[in-house]
Amino acid sequence: MLAYTYIEHGKFQLLEKPRPKIKDTRDAIVRVTLGSICTSDLHIKHGSVLRAVPGVTVGHEMVGVVEEVGSGVVSVRPGDRVTVNVETFCGECFFCRHGYVNNCTDSNGGWALGCRIDGGQAEYIRVPYADQGLNRIPDTVSDEQALFVGDVLATGFWAARISEISEEDTVLIIGAGPTGICTLLCTMLKKPRRIIVCEKSSERIQFVREHYPDVLL
């Protein structure tokens, strides 16, 4: 299969690689149907992610169809359309049990996909801890609609959630890129008194003005 691969600092390359196989009873193999590029992928390319392993397939924002599951997987089955969580996590360590899955102590835990183990800029991906890392997509939701759930939208949701926003608050969001817009959308659900977005790109400013006229820039 074709896989977009981190070769070395400043270099990615499309390579031919073997299709992934089940390694653990809790794994699933997913056929990728749609993916996107995260800024973190660019951070890897530019050498800002020291844990990134040369030779790894990059990518951690994707949706797909389950092709195969390990014997211990119970929440999904072959044929299911699924989102893939950016964080793989065991669900059992101290951090997982307290909700901080990004700090999972398992060797395949935390931000592993597309950084320390092969990610989703490929035709297929192996997802460890599939019961925690995969979520079925309803038939009424398209791949395009579900794509951001696993990372960029979840990042915006988490930011809005931990900020404990009230209806009396003024909220400042720095940046109106994809993550900033997702954060804006999730912040709007909290109905604060005022939302301010700080952005220097004229194109992004125009986008916010066009789609979110009540937001201050």
Protein language model regions, located:
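Residues that mark the start of a beta-strand
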Residues: 2, 27-29, 170, 194
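Cytochrome P450 core scaffold surrounding the K-helix E-X-X-R motif
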Residues: 40-46
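Glycine-rich beta-strand-centered segment in the early N-terminal region that forms part
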Residues: 20-35, 48-97, 138-141
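Extracellular beta-rich ligand/substrate-recognition surface
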Residues: 5-12
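Cysteine-cluster motifs in flexible loop/terminal segments that predominantly coordinate metals
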Residues: 38, 75, 86-135, 139
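Short Gly/Pro-enriched turn/cap motifs at secondary-structure boundaries
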Residues: 7, 19-20, 53-59, 113-118, ...
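Mid-domain Rossmann-like dinucleotide-binding core that forms the NAD(H)/NADP(H) cofactor-binding site
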Residues: 136-217
